[in-house]
Regions:
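Flexible, glycine/charged-enriched surface loops at secondary-structure junctions
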Residues: 28, 53-60, 85-88, 230-235, ...
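Glycine-rich phosphate-binding segment of PLP-dependent enzymes
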Residues: 43, 92-93, 103-129
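Structural motif of enzymes handling amino- and sulfur-group chemistry
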Residues: 335, 343-344, 351-402, 412-415, ...
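Short Gly/Ser/Thr- and Asp/Glu-enriched loop/turn motifs at secondary-structure junctions
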Residues: 10-11, 90-94, 322-325, 428, ...
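Long amphipathic alpha-helical segments
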Residues: 1-78
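Conserved C-terminal alpha-helix-loop-beta "cap" of PLP-dependent enzymes
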Residues: 386, 390-473
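Conserved PLP-enzyme active-site core in the AAT-like
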Residues: 83, 131-366, 401, 483
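Long amphipathic N-terminal alpha/beta scaffold segment
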Residues: 56-106, 112-113
Length: 485
């Protein structure tokens, strides 16, 4: 058959759309979606035919031109375009707060509250008892004050946003004093100095990368009176223009650590210095640990204890050790939080009803530390004991062997980690199932698992594929095993 004959054999779009399968599909997905898919399939066939050489045209599969064949291809095309880019995966890496996998899984009550709140209208900015307009800032502020001991609180969309609005409200046009050892990059090339520049505040670095004393902060303080006599050409070899000091700031080293010959000013020392000079103290905590977890090897500062040192403002993430949704949470003295709520950035950085729904349900768990430990997945994973993990590893190994008799499983000891820019030096002793799938290499097996209906994201160490059970929920064991079929 010649190329022109093949082109004449292309079916008409309307004829293909009359196929019963596409009529039903159009009712579900819409006429436009299905018509566009048919048009795309026919256009592809036309292009394929035009690319043929005359002498090879007779080799073209004419069955592809049938209406039912085009309809089938259109169905595949619609299904492919309907596939979501954001979907569930199983975390078998042993990294609890895996940034690439969405950080903290939500607790069941948070999930239910999001579903309930998002199904219809909500009390986002309406005071139901009083029958008048309300403020979203009030939704979780009382709960945060109760849990942290703060005078007031507000929520923005992430901790970088919290840093931005805190510095803009408290430090614009003034200097913020920070230790050189705490000028962190928080991920994605976003750095504290860059955020400070955007806020309009001026960075004053003190100390060195490994040692910063409280006297370094005090020596850097610039008052209005001092500015009157300040001459950058005489006082500073760099001839740097100076501004009045607006605040002292401490940034928790949550995604790295400095060991060896080190020294840093404590929150207590900074709070005392701030009171002495009438300067507020800001603590960018980052990780959001609400309760003491030292019993489980996590010796990180917690929020209530940090605020109790006398600092003025504290900010942290919602989706790290707090175990909630992505959010930037700011707690502290009422005068500073009130200024942030009125700041123009507050509207640009505000969060939606689903974030508040998840956050409120998560925070409620912290009214009883035992309940938080039981119900919040992040805390539960951190606190999992070795006996529980060993037993889960044995069940997973048995399930994988049952799914595929060619797979060789071995239970091995591993070191899990917190991840997500939290507690970088902490290693949690755990267990994993080391898997050898027939003659496949670890890399090939890892790719196979990623192609499963629910992709399994595993860990490779020393050319061994490891399924770390700390981050695999009990109800996910069957799905992991099915990925080996």
């Amino acid at each position: 058959m010649q190329k022109q004959e093949l082109l004449r054999g292309l079916p008409k779009i309307d004829d293909v759309l009359r196929q019963e399968s596409l009529v039903m599909l159009a009712e579900e997905k819409g006429d436009i979606v299905v018509t566009d898919a048919v048009r795309e399939v026919i256009a592809g066939l036309r292009a394929d035919i035009l690319d043929l050489l005359e002498e090879t045209a007779e080799l073209f599969d004419e069955s592809l031109l049938r209406e039912e064949s085009v309809a089938a291809k259109a169905e595949e095309l619609v299904a492919g375009k309907e596939k979501k880019r954001l979907f569930p995966v199983i975390n078998a890496t042993g990294t609890i707060l895996h940034t690439n996998l969405g950080r903290a899984p939500l607790c069941e009550d948070a999930i239910k509250n999001v579903e309930l709140t998002s199904r219809g209208y909500s009390s986002l900015e309406y005071n139901v008892p009083q029958g008048k307009r309300g403020s979203r800032h009030d939704l979780v502020s009382d709960l945060l004050k109760e849990l942290t001991g703060a005078e007031d609180a507000m929520v923005v969309n992430n901790n970088a946003s919290a840093t931005l609005i805190v510095l803009a409200a408290m430090g614009k046009g003034r200097e913020i004093i920070v230790s050189r050892g705490e000028l962190v990059e928080i991920g994605g090339a976003f750095r504290i100095p860059d955020i400070m520049k955007q806020s309009g505040a001026y960075l004053t670095e003190v100390g060195t990368s490994n040692k910063t004393k409280i006297s370094d902060y005090e020596d850097a303080i610039m008052t209005k009176e001092m500015l009157e006599d300040y001459d950058p050409w005489e006082s500073d070899p760099r001839h740097t223009e100076r501004f009045e000091t607006g605040a002292l700031m401490k940034v928790h080293k949550s995604n790295y650590d400095i060991v060896g010959f080190t020294e840093e000013a404590s929150l207590e020392e900074l709070a005392e210095l701030g009171k002495k000079h009438g300067l507020p103290v800001i603590f960018d905590m980052g990780n959001g640990l609400m309760q003491d977890m030292s019993e489980y090897g996590l010796n990180e500062p917690n929020i209530p204890a940090s605020l109790a040192t006398g600092i003025d403002v504290m900010l942290f993430s919602g989706d790290k050790l707090l175990g909630g949704p992505q959010a930037g949470i700011i707690v502290g003295k009422k005068e500073y939080i009130r200024a942030m709520k009125k700041h123009p950035l507050a509207r640009a950085l505000r969060v939606d009803k689903m974030t508040f729904a998840a956050l409120e349900a998560t925070l409620m768990k912290y009214r009883d530390p035992k309940i938080a430990l039981r119900d919040i997945p992040v805390l539960r994973m951190i606190a999992s004991d070795e006996e529980t993990l060993r037993e889960r590893a044995e069940r997973l190994a048995d399930a994988v062997r049952s799914a595929n008799s060619e797979v060789v499983c071995e239970i091995v000891e591993v070191e899990d980690q917190i991840g997500g820019g939290s507690a970088p030096t902490v290693r949690l002793p755990g267990y994993a199932v080391s898997v050898q799938d027939g003659n496949r290499s670890a890399d090939r097996t890892e790719k196979k698992l990623r192609k499963a209906e629910v992709p399994v994201i595993a860990r490779i160490n020393d050319d061994r594929l490891l399924l770390c059970v700390r981050t695999i929920a009990d109800d996910e064991i069957k799905q992991v095993a099915e990925a080996f079929r």
